[in-house]
Amino acid sequence: MSDKIGLFTGSFDPMTNGHLDMIERASRLFDKLYVGIFFNPHKQGFLPLENRKRGLEKAVKHLGNVKVVSSHDELVVDVAKRLGATCLVRGLRNASDLQYEASFDYYNHQLSSDIETIYLHSRPEHLYISSSGVRELLKFGQDIACYVPESILEEIRNEKKD
């Protein structure tokens, strides 16, 4: 029997504790879970991709079946096929997230009908945490330690030094 392989994607700019919770939960559903950091052309970059990847790898190092990958110019479905993933994992905080994700699910299914999408609902303590909210707090010099993993906080501090 073949391994169950999933792909959880996002821009993770920056990764939040909500993302980490989703990754931890999704890792229990699969033999192998890839976490794909994708460039989002609709969002202005905050942290360079290398910093995001390094911080995310440190944040998930306790999960033996999780591997972090990145992509600049590929469709999620194509990356899933290349990695052997048969399931895309998406996180939902609210109805707006579902509506946003449903359109991608439609196209993904049209491009590859053998790749399914599953949705994990945010835990109540993470419902209102978002990367854009964290970026806004940082813009005004606020402490974000309770919203992001320590490794991400380190990457942000290191990036500010440069």
Curated annotation (Swiss-Prot):
PANTHER family: PHOSPHOPANTETHEINE ADENYLYLTRANSFERASE (PTHR21342:SF1). The gene is coaD. Reversibly transfers an adenylyl group from ATP to 4'-phosphopantetheine, yielding dephospho-CoA (dPCoA) and pyrophosphate. GO terms for biological process: coenzyme A biosynthetic process. Keywords: ATP-binding, Coenzyme A biosynthesis, Cytoplasm, Magnesium, Nucleotide-binding, Nucleotidyltransferase, Transferase. GO terms for molecular function: ATP binding; pantetheine-phosphate adenylyltransferase activity. GO terms for cellular component: cytoplasm. It is an enzyme of class 2 (transferase). Its cofactor is Mg(2+). It comes from Streptococcus pneumoniae (strain ATCC 700669 / Spain 23F-1). Pathway: Cofactor biosynthesis; coenzyme A biosynthesis; CoA from (R)-pantothenate: step 4/5. SUPFAM superfamilies: Nucleotidylyl transferase (SSF52374). It comes from the Bacteria. This is Phosphopantetheine adenylyltransferase.
